[in-house]
Amino acid sequence: MNRREFNQAALLAGGAALFGAAGFQLGAPSKAMSQTLPTLPDPEASGIEHIVAVTMENRSFDHFFGWMPNADGQQAGLTYLDTKGAAHATHSLSGDNTGCPGKDPDHSYTGSRVCYDGGKMDGFLLDTANDRYCIGYYGEKDIPFYAALAQNYTTCNRYFASILGPTFPNRMFIHAAQTDRLTDSILPTTLPTIWDRLAAKNVSHAYYFNNVPYLALWGTKYLGITRTWGQFQRDAAKGTLPSVSFLDPRYTILDDGTGNDDHPHADIREGDKFLYNVFQALSKGPAWSSTVLVVNFDEWGGFFEHVPPPRAEAANSVDTDIVNGKTLLGMRLPVVVASPYSAGNPNSPIINSLVFDHTSVLKLVEWRWGLQPLTPRDASSDIYNLAYALDFSSPQTAVPNLPKPHTPFLVVPCFENLTGLFSSRAAQPGQVGAPSSSAQKTALWGDLRTMAQKNGFPVG
């Protein structure tokens, strides 16, 4: 079975699982599929020498990638009821690059469960913190570079956030395979991380950032491995990137149009441009032939999604919604794996339908360099190693000619509470002009940036 045949079979099996076919757990891969997984090579002989993970912010699969053929996406034609029983249809956001002034959709631990609604996935407008912005969607032409990257490489359409909750808990999973909080908080943490495992095995590693280093939550512990976006570009150009690199975008600290993380109300054209620059730096560098680039999103941002997340092995007891030792994953994310080992055909894009989450990236790192799992989550068979999204039989080092992002364009700041400047997208059921949770989130990033600066991080 070659990779394309395997991915097609996985898509069919995954779809059957989601509809509760006999012998399947909701959203989980089938036993039959686990028996037909391709055999992974010896890690040291795999050809992979560099893994780069870039984590954007707050978009669901249907919202960003629902247009993609054969990927189980849905966009137009869905309707959701609000708290008054009125039906609202999903709508295109094309041309509205910031979503301003729609409210930053609720994606808190509690609000997410209103949207999830016991797996019915119909509560996005039953959450009173939301307006119609949360059921809007973008098309292929709105994110030309990222859309083309997805179609020329491998898209994961069953990659879920690690917890049904907000940014900080999910980003903690990205580094630690667990979280010690259910809310966005800058309280310091001491959780062991993948960086500790890499250091113990003398595997080179670095964390790169733009304006706020998330690793500052660990105090000064990881100051020595933290580098700037400019350094990432230089290292990629020279072929001196370490074995493992995680890269964060420019977080949307203010609604001033300068963020490139895709978090509302950042301009998605800025995010597309950032990802283009990341890919150019890697694919034009001397180490591209041995590199795997993973572009994921920390969580779904409260945007509509029709596929209910499955449960997976609990990493610890912080998430109290545990059923038979398993907790809910978050919603699906628009994730792409770009590498000579994941190249595809844009006329028939590769869709991988195995169940992944953020610990799948950690599993890939652990597999490649012989590291022990951090928690029961990344040790679990509930979640697959992202290596199964790769084809080791015939790497294709030729780089496709991908479209450039929309440039140049005018950056327009978004001010949520300016009366009279609101579009119909912000109409009922949300209150027009009401403050959204983005104000709290941006203040939090600002506080973390200040804390990092005091601890000596190169935040400028």
What do the PLM-derived regions correspond to, one by one?
Residues E5-G460:
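N-terminal pro-sequences and low-complexity stem/linker regions of secreted or lumenal proteins
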